[in-house]
Amino acid sequence: MDKIKENAFVKKIGFNSLVLFCILILLYILFAVLIPVVNSDANANFVTWAHILSAMNYACFMGFLSLGVTFVIATGGIDFSIGPVMFCAALIAGYQLTTNGWPLALCLILCILVGTAFGVLNGLLVTYLGLPSFITSMASMMIAKGLGSVFTKTQPVSWPQLSDASGNGWYRNLVRMQVGGMTVPTGLVLLVIGAVICAIILNKTKAGRYILCIGSNREAVRLSGVNTKGWETLAYILCGTLAGIAAIFYVGVYTTVQPGLGDTFNNEAIAGCVMGGTSMTGGVASIGGTLIGVLIMALLQEGIMTMGLQINYQYIITGLIVLVVVYADLRSRRRRN
């Protein structure tokens, strides 16, 4: 009976997600043991709340990017515009806040609307005009980078600090908040809530089932009378909306936004998604896996920086991990076929 219950538990949470969680714990232990050996600095102690908070700061905005692109990849598509779209949303909304004096709440909503607009654009171009998602998202990436730069006249935009006299710094509490003298990673809490909502959409709704079916066998779904264009467009809209939400958390962490950037976040978001078990060929996706994949990415970045190494090492390790994961996914699919 106990074994049956155990198997049911593993099946419910997903075997791959369970394996990823074990990898996350082992990675943390590895860094905790290795960092004091590699880095003799007295401050190079990985087992501190400060390092955990730093990793969570990165995870909270990267997580929303990865959750969004999970929906697109589930359809068999790709979106390389999410990073620049996040920056574009933060630049436009921040410019309206600091230059034109718009209310902070309205600017936060504007972040989401800008991201959603790019999602609608990408979805319509891919589904109704039949453009390849790779080309479409590359074009949107350039448009987002250019639009943000033109809007701000190529100048960086600085969002208010928490201590700002205007009182507009409260949005930073969305990322971290002081409670009884302790810093709480509220961004991670909100990310988990967002992941639960995304998991419900993907696994418990008609929209999610159609998105996965489109990625698995688009033609069969179309012949069954389903509006594949509409559901696929929805996947891109969700991706854009979540990129807009990610912009809010990004400025909550870094405050200052530079125009013309954001490309590297595309690769990191997609890597977290793929690492979490979402198939690049579509039809298979795991929101829980994506969340853990992002946490692994965050831990990897924080660990490498604490070791005193350049961030480029993270790119090398992440690239190798993605190659292994994609290769394993292709081998698994060939065996099933």
Predicted feature descriptions by range:
Residues 1-29, 33, 196, 216, ...:
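Cytosolic-side transmembrane-helix boundaries in multi-pass membrane proteins
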Residues 2-64, 100-106, 337:
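Membrane-interfacial amphipathic/re-entrant helices at transmembrane-helix boundaries
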Residues 7, 134-137, 141-204, 231-234, ...:
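Transmembrane helix-bundle core of multi-pass membrane transporters
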Residues 20-33, 69, 112, 141-146, ...:
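Hydrophobic core segments of alpha-helical transmembrane domains in multi-pass membrane transport
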Residues 31-32, 48-100, 125-131, 277-287, ...:
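Single transmembrane alpha-helix segments in multi-pass membrane proteins
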Residues 101-141, 292-293:
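Alpha-helical transmembrane segments within multi-pass membrane transporters and channels
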Residues 102, 107-108, 118-122, 181-256:
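Helix-loop-helix "hairpin" substructures at the membrane interface of multi-pass membrane proteins
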Residues 236-237, 243, 253-318:
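Transmembrane alpha-helical segments in multi-pass inner-membrane proteins
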